Amino acid sequence: MTSTADVFDKKDQFNFVFPFTAIVGQEEMKISLLLNVVDPKIGGVMIMGDRGTGKTTTIRALVDILPDILVVKDDPYNSHPHDVDLMSSEVQALVLNRMNIETCYTKVPLVDLPLGATEDRVCGSIDIEKALSEGKKSFEPGLLAKANRGLLYVDEINLLDDHLVDVLLDCSASGWNLVEREGISVKHPSKFVLIGSGNPEEGELRPQLLDRFGLHAEIKTVKDPELRVKIVEERTEFDKDPVAYIRKFSKSQDELREKIINAQNLLPKVEMPRELKFNISKICGILDIDGLRGDIVTNRASKAYAAIQQRNVVEIGDIQKVIVSCLRHRLRKDPLEIIESGEKIQKAFTNIF
């Protein structure tokens, strides 16, 4: 496992990243990201907020606190050497034939999806001419292949083509990418945490797409002058000497990484009392939330938060910490309503609990 102190020994690390534990404020965004890392089944996170509030900085910082993953060496899909659901068909064939597989540890991939990306760039492309002339499937993996077992980040996702957003959400939910062209199909694992960010002034996602994101974090510009000055000072110190600044936070970074590993291991043992499950569903009913995604995600996020706190039983406080992010984007829009969505959810929570 890579520790923060090791990064200075690697040549590819000289593009320094601001430490996650040094980021001031924006707790809702940080917690939403950590919950998805502990339990990727939560279904990703949509981060909406003003420009210059640290959305991209925080997402890039997340990778440095994640434990390294074991992969098959030189495999374009980051295949797991033992888990069949995370293997490409080529690696599966090697395993079935009991061939030796060379493995190595690598950092969790963070793949950026540019707004102008074509479907072939995202999903991968099949060389039809080669397939017809030589009878071989020639597949060029896309961004979804690179993102397997990692994070896929789309900045300004609200401006991305709806069809591509649909493709990303389908892959994120199923863990597989299926490419079909002219009767030829290729399937490969693509299990990732989808992270979208955007500015609400530039438009929202369609409600049907928004509902499929597990969590929704709202980021606002810090108003407190003390905090604003602190943020400016921290950034100035980092820019002046990034090596010294990263070393300063190496202990807290390593501690958080250890906390994530422990939470991932504890998660399968975390239980939620039936009474709390019932109350979550009651809140979703009172708020008139369509479908059951809200119930499911709130249950999962509450368990993940309890695991981060190193507890194997969910408490009321765990639910309160995550419920706004789980339900905010699932509320029906009422243009005449004055109360903010977060306040409405907290009010319903207080009435039930």
Curated annotation (Swiss-Prot):
Which InterPro entries does this entry report, sorted A to Z? AAA+_ATPase, CHLI-like, ChlI/MoxR_AAA_lid, Mg_chelatase_ATPase-isu, Mg_chelatse_chII-like_cat_dom, P-loop_NTPase
Q: Which reaction does it catalyse?
A: protoporphyrin IX + Mg(2+) + ATP + H2O = Mg-protoporphyrin IX + ADP + phosphate + 3 H(+)
| GO cellular component terms, semicolon-separated | chloroplast
Coiled coil regions in record: none
List residues binding ATP. 49-56
Q: Is Ligase among the key words of this record?
A: yes
Coarse class of the primary localization is plastid
- Biological processes per GO annotation: chlorophyll biosynthetic process; photosynthesis
Q: Which SMART domains has this protein been placed in?
A: AAA (SM00382)
Pathway assigned to this chain's UniProt record? Porphyrin-containing compound metabolism; chlorophyll biosynthesis
- Similarity field: Belongs to the Mg-chelatase subunits D/I family.
What name goes with this protein? Answer: Magnesium-chelatase subunit ChlI
State the organism named in the record.
Cyanidium caldarium
